[in-house]
């Protein structure tokens, strides 16, 4: 089928516009997702460093637990931070009061200091496992996690909006 000149120009314009809009939508989605992940990862790193300073490295427990618990009770937290301490044998030696009877899962196959998504009580969390070393000897791990559900809902909603609005643009 041979198309006339005007039809070919219109078709090329239509396809080019569709590709450009798709690229813009992809950039918006990827930018937002990356920003959310970087923000959560930054918060997790900060919390890990703070709690690492409060750690009794010989016993792998929080050094001043009473003060730590008081601070946790005084703060109103929208995104609570979960902290768990493991010894070198991956046994729990201490954990934050907000974990109650729950525990954060240790993933031995996961690389150290890499942030990843997992679940706690069937709820989405973002977690990082950092080794605790003294003079190069592994003493244990500090696991820090935060809820990721609200952030994931935002990412999912944006994707849905972009997919629905793409055909109309």
Language-model features: where?
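Juxtamembrane segments flanking the first transmembrane helix
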Residues: 1-82, 88-89, 148-156
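Hydrophobic alpha-helical transmembrane segments of multipass membrane transporters and ion channels
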Residues: 15-20, 160, 164-168
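Extracytoplasmic
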Residues: 91, 97-163
